[in-house]
Amino acid sequence: MPALEFTHRAFAERPVEGPLVLGLSGPQGCGKSTLAADLVAGFGWLGLRATCLSVDDVYLRRDEQVALSERFPGAPIFADRGFPGTHDVELGRRLLDSLATVEPGEFVRVPSYDKSAFGGRGDRKPHVEWPEVACPLDLVVFEGWMLGFTPASEPTDPALAQANEFLRRYEVWHERLGAFLHLDAAAPDFVVGWRVEAERRRRESGAAGLTDAEAESYVRRFLPAYSLWTPALRDRPPIQGPSLRLVLGSDRLPVGP
């Protein structure tokens, strides 16, 4: 498993004590959450302690999301969660710092987001409902579809101009990553199929999920963002430390570096 081998090597060679924070980036439906869970399990088999977080955990509260949308009425991408600008970046920074520095035997509460709240518009759960993570840890996997994206010099899509500007705030996350793993789609349209499949599996399991048409419509909103920001990520990882790029075929399996 190249991802586990890469992550364990980065952990073994990390220059400072404390947990390795691995940034895991990849398009929607590519298997980030599954891989993150596999890495946590793999470290467990090695007798090491690990947990995984998602950028989704630190989405804005619903009232903050509404305020953002009202602030930029001409930018429909801010009507709902997802794009750069819809996360509490400072909350994410504090969370990563806490997991890295808390005293042994203590616990850190991790934000939790309820995507079903407000008829599917979503809201952050109250602090008392946040799960606790026991520390110290050896590995923190921090995953997200737009993790590692950096501002484009000249965004060609005016609808993404403000989101591009918001990306500058996310540098504080990159500064806390000790290694970076990029799952890249070999073809852009794979992303659409992956999301449709994911929603289909969710429905088949008995959970609420988008129809095929709804899932395709939803994910196509993000394709311009991938086109704008992914090329730079391919050329230049967001950190100076160890990084690995895995190109995925339509079956989500690596086809090459």
Locate predicted features.
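Extended hydrophobic secondary-structure segments that form protein cores and membrane-embedded regions
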Residues: 21-26, 52-55, 180-182, 245-247
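Conserved lysine of the Walker
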Residues: 32
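Conserved NTP phosphate-binding and transfer environment spanning the P-loop NTPase/kinase superfamily
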Residues: 137-139, 145-257
